[in-house]
Amino acid sequence: TNYKKKIKQLEDDLLFRLSNSQGNLLDDVELIEVLNNTKITAQEVNEKLANASETNAKITEACEEYRPVAHRATLIYFLIAEFASVNVMYQTSLKQFNEIYELAIDDAEPAQMPAKRIVNIIEHMTYSVYLYIQRGLFERHKLTFALMMTNKILISAKQLSPDNVNVFLKGGGSLDIKSVRKKPKEWIPDKCWLDINALQKTAAFSDILDSFDRNEPMWKKWYDLEAPEQVNVPDFEDRITKFEKMMIVKAMREDRTQVAAQAYIGDAIGQRFVESVPINVEATWEETTPYIPVICLLSAGSDPTKLIEELAKKKKLKLSGVSMGQGQEIIARKLIQTAVKKGEWVILQNTHLGLNYMAEIEVYLTKAEELHDDFRLWITAEPHPQFPIGLLQMSIKLTNEAPVGMRAGLRNSYAWVTQDMMDAVPRYEWRQLLFTMCYLHSIVQERRKFGPIGWNIQYEFNASDLGACVQFLQNHITEMDMKKLNSPTWPTVTYMISSIQYGGRITDGFDELLMDTYAGKYFNQNALTKGIELFPGYRVPDSTDVTDFRADIEALPLTESPEIFGLHPNADLTFRTLAVSQMVSTIVDTMPKSGGGGGGKSPEEIVNAICADLLSKVPEPFVPEIAKEMLKKLPGGPTQPLTVHLRQEIDRLNIIIILATKTLKNLQLAIAGTLALAGDLVDALDKLFNAAIPASWLKKSWESATIGTWFQGLLMRHKQLDKWLREGRPKAYWLTGFFNPQGFLTAMKQEVNRQHAKDKWALDDVVMTSQVTHPPKDVEQLKDGMSEGVYVYGLFLEGCRWDGKQNKLVDSDPKKLYTPLPVLEVTGVLQKDKVTKGVYEAPTYRVKKRTGLNFISTFPLRTEDPPSKWVMRGVALLCSVD
C-alpha cells in the first residue's frame, strides 16, 4: 500500500509540474530531472511491488499449509463449549483457549519440514488443551470428554462415519423385539439383540445376523468371556476398526464398553489421552496471575485445602481463609484487601453458599488495576447453576476427588485417627471397635457406587457421621470400663449407629433395613475377637500403635470384590453398565439439536419416518360407551373391585393412546410446514430423533429406556386390557402392564375378603402373601385362574435367582443381572396366619430405579438362607428391566 501511495504521489507531482510549466518543456531542466527521478522511482517501486506480491503469495500459501492447525483448534474449542452443558462449572472462555493455543504453538517441537512441524503443533496443542480441560473435570466425565474429542477428530478426518456414532449411541432404541428377526438362541438378551439389529444397518456389520445364525456357539463363547474386548470378534475381527469393535462390545457386553473405549482412544489419538494424570497444585499455581483465581470443584469426601496449605508453606507465603456462608462476606473482603497489598494468598471455601459475593469478586478482579504480584485467590465450590459464568471463564478449574475403594476409605479415616485418640480408652475393645467403625463407614460410603442395588437413595454419608459414632463408642467403652462390664450393650450400640447417627440421613425404609443389617453384622460379641477378619483379607490389627493400623491398611488390596459389601460379584457388571449408560446419556445430551442424521437424512426426515411407523402400529383407543357396556357383562358386574380397576386402567390408557396419536400427527404436520414447531413438539422431535420418549408422554405414562421398549409396552398393555374386557378375567395378570399395580393388589385383597364374608374377616386384618408356583410354571402352563387370589407374572429378580427344583432363592448365575420369576400365586390372608419364617420379603418396584414412587409392595419368597443375606445382596423384584 505504501509503495502504491508513493507512485501516486510522484504521478501527482509530475502532473502538477507539467501543467504549470511555461515555455519549452525540453528547456525546463528541473522538470526533466523530476521526470527521470519519477521513472527510476517507479521502476524501483514496481520491483518492490512484485517482490511484495510474491512474498504475499508465499505467506498465503504458508497460511493455507497451517490451516489444519486452526481447523483442529476450532474443532476442540467448540467441543469445550458444548461440554459446558454437562456441568455449568466447565466454562472456558475463548480468551483462555487462545492463550493455550498460542503457547502450544510456541512449545511444539520444531521441525525442518513444514508438514512435520504442522503435525507436531497439532499433537502438542491437542494434548495441551486436553490436559488443561481434564484437570477441571470430575473423574466420571474425563473418559467421556476424551471419547467425544476422538470422535470429532476422526469424523473431521473422514475416518469415522457420523452414522456409526449415531448407532453406537442409540443402539436399537427405536426397534421393537417383535418386529426384528427372531433370536437364534434364548441366551441372547432382548436388548442385545435389538442393538445387534441396529448394527446390521451399518456397512461393517451388514451380515452380522447371518453370522449369529452360522456361528452362534462362537458368539456365545465370546459373550461369556471376562474381557471380550481383548479377544478377536467372531467373523469380524479382520475387517472392523477399533470404533466398530467398540460398537459390538457395547451391543453385546455393555459393561466392557469403557475398556473398549480406552483402547479405541489410545489407538486413534494416543495412549496418553486415557492415562490418569495426577493432580499438581504447584503446576496449576504457576499458570495463575493475581487476576486469575483457581476454582477447586468439590465432590463428596474431597477437600484441596491441605494441598493449598502445603504449597503456601513451601513458597513461604501467608495463606488466610474463610468458609463462606451468611455474614462471611465482610471477613472475606478484609482478607482480600490485606492480601492484595501484602502479596498473600486467600482461600474462600464453600463459595456456593455465598454466590452474591462471588459476583462481587468477578467485578473486582475484572476492574482491579494494581494487585500485588504475589497475591493469589483460591476458591472452593460445589457445582451450582447460579455460579457466575464470568468468574468461571476467567479462572483455572481444578478437581481433586477423593480416592475410591475400601483401602482409600480406611486410609482417610485413619489419617483423622490420632495416637491420642487410640490411647483415649486403655482397653483393646476400644481399638477393635474403632477400626470396625471406620470399616463400616467405608462400607456404607463405597456401596453407593453400585446404584440402586447398593442404596435406593444416594446418601451423603460423611466424616461427621463417623465422628459422631466414634465419640459415642468412646463414651460407651469408657462407661463400660467404669462399670467393670465385660462387653458393650450391643442393642444400644447398633441402635445408636444405625438408627440415630447414620439413620438420621436415611429416608427409605429398605435402606434403613440394610443399615440395621450392617450394624448387626459388625457390632456383636464376635467384634471383640482379637485378630477377627471382617472379610477375608481385612483383619482388625492387634496393636496399640496407630502407625501399625496405617501400615496394615496400606497393605490392603487396591480394589475389592462386591462381596465385601454383601453383594453378588455380578454387582460389578451393574456398576460398569451404569457408568456406560451415564457416559452415553452425557454424549447424547451435548449433541447439537440439529444436523445430519443417518444415511444423509435430516433429523426431520428420520423423525417423520418414525412417526409414520408408530402411527401404523398405535392401537385404536377404547370407545367409552362400548367399554362401559362390556364391563357390565363381566362376571360379578361392574362393581367388582378388579372390574373397577380394569375400568380405571382403560381410562388411563386411552389418555396415552390419544396423546401419542395427536403428538405423532402434529409432528408430521410440523415437519411438512403446515403447523408451527413449538413447545412440546420441539421436545418430541428431539426425543424421537434420539430414540427417547417425549416428556409429555412420560408425564402421563410409565418410565422406559427407549421409545422402542415404551411403544412395545403400550401395545402389550392394550392387548391385556382388551382381552380382559372381551374374554373375561385372564388366568394370570401381567403386573407390569398396570398404571396402578398397588390398586390392583388392593382390589385382589378386597375380593378375597368378600369371599370370606361368612368368616367375618375385617379388611384391615387382611394382608397380602405370595408363593412361587411349584413346580414353577409359565403363563402358558396355567389351566385356570386362582379360585382365591390371582396369578401374577412378568416380574424379574435382581441380585439373585429362583431355583425351581429346590423352590427357593439362590445366588445369581455369573453375568445374569436379572432373571425372570416364574408365575407367582398372590392372595390375601389374615395377619395372624401369614408365614414370616423362612421367607424374604422382596421389595417390588416398577423399574430399576428404586425410589418411593416406583415402590409397589413386598412379596414374600421362600429362602433357606438368612433374609439378611438377601438384604445385603440388594435383592428386589422389578416389573421392568427394559
What annotation goes with each model-predicted range?
Residues 313-321, 334-341, 345, 350-379, ...:
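Conserved catalytic/switch belt of AAA+ P-loop NTPases
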Residues 133, 192, 199, 213-214, ...:
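Long C-terminal appendages of very large multidomain proteins
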Residues 91-341, 543, 549-552, 559, ...:
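Extended, compositionally biased accessory segments flanking or bridging domains
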Residues 278-284, 307-308, 331-335, 362-366, ...:
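Eukaryotic intrinsically disordered and solvent-exposed regulatory patches
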Residues 3-74, 407-521:
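Conserved AAA+ ATPase small/helical "lid" subdomain
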Residues 387-405:
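A short helix-turn-beta junction within AAA+ P-loop NTPase domains corresponding to the substrate/partner-engaging
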Residues 298-301, 350-352, 379-384, 401-403:
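A short beta-strand-to-loop transition that corresponds to the Sensor-1 phosphate-sensing loop
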Residues 31-127, 677, 681-748, 754:
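Proline-directed phosphorylation-rich, low-complexity intrinsically disordered regulatory regions
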